[in-house]
Amino acid sequence: MKITALASAILAVAQGALALPARAPALDITLSQVNNTRIKAVVKNSGTEKITFVHLNFFNDPSPVKKVSLYRNATEVEFTGIKQRLRSDGLSNDALTTLAPGATYEDEFDIASTANLTQGGPVTVRTQGFVPIAMNNKIAGYIPYSSNELELEVDAEKAVAVPASIKPLDRRTKITSSCTGNRATVLNTALRNAASIASKAADAASSGSSALFTEYFKSTSGNIRSAVAARLKAVASEASMNGGGSTTYYCSDPYGYCDSNVLAYTLPSTNEVVNCELFYTLQEVTNDCHGQDQATTIIHEFTHAPGVYPPGTEDLGYGYSAATALSTSNALNNADSYALFANGTSSFCVMTAFS
């Protein structure tokens, strides 16, 4: 029933590229094969002005993030790396890249480290999305990026030899032993708040202001509203389970991928959610319109987990400017669209078209 609601909603809107603003600068990505599953990406500033952007969750991020999408026979290959939620201000300088007009940089990575390509054969590689622009170490906007389509013939024997970026852990418990003392208290409060906010957001998606809904999802269709409500209800249900749901929750980082810019991350392939140190510096619930807090960070991460509501979301547009520039079909598949909508409904953000 979950899949049907989302599938019918996506079929109800045009299947197309990301909605891009007029006259926007852009990054062009050229993908090429280095050796079997090892890929090189050349990132070029194709605009006329110097730009500084956040390269986390993007090319040059050393963590096993989703840099490209892989397809076999038009079906996307499951991603087995991590999806991070970043801080929106106070970004460290080492998270930023500056490119002059026409300038480039390169990144090499092995796609077999974050996807099971052991059966070999033809695989199509491509990518597109938005990357955040930074000013004064704060996310201040976005620029679109897109790549060529790269066709590979994967050698299965060589793909098997590539080590996975994420090593499996013992996941017998749902809220792990890392969640004790104050961190357990913080997590339980955050889960309760996330459940309440997601539930209210689900109601707003179903029957609230059409102008508010359109601000985030670019549609007033009943199917679209039902699909958004269904995912948010599933998130509210998961947050109410107190460890008995589909996700495994870590209050500290067992894999070593947190840094000073990452609030939390999710491993969609195993439905694991990890809080980083930065998570504990956030407010429980913010009153700032489109601000970050613990509750909506959990909402963001739970939408990534397919065990909560399949399929899990991507990070197609990060932050309010990028998320609200997405087409309907892409907003439905974007984690921050749900977190921002939930924040907007709970803190009564006033939209320009609010009715």
From Swiss-Prot:
Subcellular location: Secreted
Domain of life: Eukaryota
Disulfide bonds: 179-251, 258-276
Alphabetized PROSITE patterns for the sequence: ZINC_PROTEASE
Pfam families: Peptidase_M35 (PF02102)
Propeptide segment residues: 20-172
A biological process term (GO) from this entry: proteolysis
Cofactor entry: Zn(2+)
Cofactor detail note: Binds 1 zinc ion per subunit.
InterPro entries: Fungal_M35_metalloproteases, Lys_MEP, MetalloPept_cat_dom_sf, Peptidase_M35
Gene Ontology terms, MF aspect: metal ion binding; metalloendopeptidase activity
Listed EC numbers: 3.4.24.39
Catalyzed reaction equations: Preferential cleavage of bonds with hydrophobic residues in P1'. Also 3-Asn-|-Gln-4 and 8-Gly-|-Ser-9 bonds in insulin B chain
Binding site for Zn(2+): 300, 304, 315
Protein's UniProt keywords contain Protease: yes
Family indicated by similarity: Belongs to the peptidase M35 family.
Protein name: Neutral protease 2 homolog AFUB_100460
